[in-house]
Amino acid sequence: MARIAGVDIPKNERVEIGLTRIFGIGRSLSNKILKETGVEPNKRVKDLTDDEIVKIRSEIEKNYKVEGELRKEISMNIKRLMDIGCYRGLRHMANLPVRGQRTRTNSRTRKGPRRKIMKKK
């Protein structure tokens, strides 16, 4: 297993797919990284040389925010919205949909399960 950005990448996966295991790297970014480092995308992770792994690792560390650093930035952005009290921040605080979806029906994922209300007798 190759370890890149703190993530173990399975040996038998293709490199372009294996890199997508890292939070913040999708297929297009994975292909871009491999093109910049000169590594064949269809190569299996087990066939990579140590030099190629070091190239990929240094390219990611140098140019991209991934894993913990990216998660921290996202959470800080949400916290900033909540601190300034803007509409999006208020929606985050209330655990409601942030991007304008309807809430009269739907939005159960964001609101959580329905709460039971006792019937009047």
Swiss-Prot record:
What's an example Gene Ontology biological process for this entry? translation
- Write out the entry's keywords from A to Z: Ribonucleoprotein, Ribosomal protein, RNA-binding, rRNA-binding, tRNA-binding
GO CC terms on record? cytosol; small ribosomal subunit
One Gene Ontology MF term: rRNA binding
Supply the PROSITE patterns for this chain: RIBOSOMAL_S13_1 (PS00646), RIBOSOMAL_S13_2 (PS50159)
InterPro entries for the chain:
Rbsml_uS13_C, Ribosomal_uS13, Ribosomal_uS13-like_H2TH, Ribosomal_uS13_bac-type, Ribosomal_uS13_CS
Q: Which residue ranges have biased composition labelled Basic residues? A: 101-121
Kindly indicate whether the keyword rRNA-binding belongs to this entry.
Answer: yes
Annotated region described as Disordered, given as residue ranges: 99-121
Is this entry keyworded Phosphoprotein? no
Under the heading Gene3D superfamilies, the entry gives:
1.10.8.50, 30s ribosomal protein s13, domain 2
Q: How does it assemble?
A: Part of the 30S ribosomal subunit. Forms a loose heterodimer with protein S19. Forms two bridges to the 50S subunit in the 70S ribosome.
Question: What protein family is recorded?
Answer: Belongs to the universal ribosomal protein uS13 family.
What NCBIfam families does the record tag this protein with?
Answer: uS13_bact
Write out the function statement from the record. Answer: Located at the top of the head of the 30S subunit, it contacts several helices of the 16S rRNA. In the 70S ribosome it contacts the 23S rRNA (bridge B1a) and protein L5 of the 50S subunit (bridge B1b), connecting the 2 subunits; these bridges are implicated in subunit movement. Contacts the tRNAs in the A and P-sites.
The entry's protein name is Small ribosomal subunit protein uS13
What gene is behind this protein? rpsM
